[in-house]
Swiss-Prot record:
InterPro entries: Cerato-ulmin_hydrophobin, Hydrophobin_sf. GO terms for cellular component: extracellular region. Gene3D superfamilies: Hydrophobin. Belongs to the cerato-ulmin hydrophobin family. Aerial growth, conidiation, and dispersal of filamentous fungi in the environment rely upon a capability of their secreting small amphipathic proteins called hydrophobins (HPBs) with low sequence identity. Class I can self-assemble into an outermost layer of rodlet bundles on aerial cell surfaces, conferring cellular hydrophobicity that supports fungal growth, development and dispersal; whereas Class II form highly ordered films at water-air interfaces through intermolecular interactions but contribute nothing to the rodlet structure. Its main location: secreted. Disruption phenotype: Does not affect conidial rodlet bundles, conidial hydrophobicity, adhesion to insect cuticle, insect pathogenicity, UVB resistance nor heat tolerance. CDD domains: hydrophobin_II. It comes from Metarhizium robertsii (strain ARSEF 23 / ATCC MYA-3075) (Metarhizium anisopliae (strain ARSEF 23)). Residues 1-16 form the signal peptide. This is Class II hydrophobin 3.
């Protein structure tokens, strides 16, 4: 019985271990702000309006900035959008 409890504990620890998946690749940091977006306005580096996914897959923050600049928008790393709006964002690294 103790062996089963120890095996379950080890299996749980292995499943809960962090991986190298960052969501946005090398564009955005892992965690909450992991979704690369192109936004028309980023206010105080926290609130973003009219955000859309980039038209191409960016390689890094500079590439995201260039992709967004083609449409006159700013590169941002956002929380998962709710109702099509990404409200909580920060400026993308390298942008």
């Amino acid at each position: 019985m103790k062996l089963l409890a120890v095996a379950a504990l080890l299996a749980g620890a292995a499943i809960a271990a962090p991986t190298s998946n960052t969501g946005g690749g090398s564009v955005c940091p892992s965690g909450l702000y992991s979704n690369p977006q192109c936004c028309s306005t980023v206010i105080i580096g926290v609130i973003a309006l009219d955000c859309k996914s980039p038209s191409e897959v960016p390689r890094d923050g500079t590439d995201l900035r260039n992709i967004c600049a083609k449409t006159g928008q700013k590169a941002a790393c956002c929380v998962i959008p709710v109702a099509g709006q990404a409200l909580l964002c920060e400026t993308a690294p390298g942008a």
